């Protein structure tokens, strides 16, 4: 082959290579360029896409409306109404305990927490709180009713529970019970039992004392006391009731005190200057 022919073949080969390269580039451009994107978009189910987008937007609007509605409905609490007669709990104390409710959220205010705070007050027996549309709260309070006084400053309810040990509240006209610390239940039970037993002979018990050494004294509305001591208390009480019903009830207004710490009788101290008798 002549040198000229070799040069010609080489030139033709270079042209064919360049042409193939340009063809490949054009093919690549068709697969990755704007035309390829147009072809890809043609395969997307636009009707379905638009349907799903519309549904999503609809529920988004519904949710936004609900949130806005709840915010509009959830007004701050403007009024707190207290229902129930208050004899022992001051209005100031109740107002302070209810202060977390004022201007709080109507729906999310902590009613249970406030209820527990109210019932933690010694004079509050029961509390209930309810919402009143649109911006009020109603509080129902039931106070403890003192049945007897304990150690001058405390009070026991009718169920025998010492609900307050010390208080500045003074309730007049209640029976008075006194005893060592933690003896309130025993003293209360004996008071109830002896009050019922002595009422059968016309005596009204208005106080019971349990001394630290274990001795018992009963006081009556007539103004005198019965000393039962600490031994055979029930037996001594029975002997006294029999004697009182038979003999002493006619002279009850003259009695200053009765000592039942005897085996076979009692010693009576009279209000007048009379020597005590045994019977």
From Swiss-Prot:
Where are the membrane-spanning stretches?
Answer: 49-69
Q: Which residues lie on this side of the membrane: Periplasmic?
A: 70-279
Q: Where is the POTRA domain?
A: 75-144
Where is the segment annotated Disordered? 1-28
InterPro entries, per this entry?
Answer: Cell_div_FtsQ/DivIB_C (IPR005548), FtsQ (IPR026579), FtsQ_C_sf (IPR045335), POTRA (IPR034746), POTRA_FtsQ_type (IPR013685)
PROSITE patterns (UniProt xref): POTRA (PS51779)
Q: Does the keyword Electron transport apply?
A: no
> Which Gene3D superfamilies is this protein grouped with?
Cell division protein FtsQ/DivIB, membrane protein fhac
GO cellular component term, pick one: plasma membrane
Topology Cytoplasmic: residue spans: 1-48
* Keywords carried by this UniProt record: Cell cycle, Cell division, Cell inner membrane, Cell membrane, Membrane, Transmembrane, Transmembrane helix
Task: Give the residue range of the signal peptide.
Answer: none
The places in or outside the cell where this protein is found are:
Cell inner membrane
Query: What biological-process GO terms show up in the record?
Result: cell septum assembly; FtsZ-dependent cytokinesis
Q: Which family does it belong to?
A: Belongs to the FtsQ/DivIB family. FtsQ subfamily.
What is the name attached to this protein's record? Cell division protein FtsQ
- Name the gene that codes for it: ftsQ
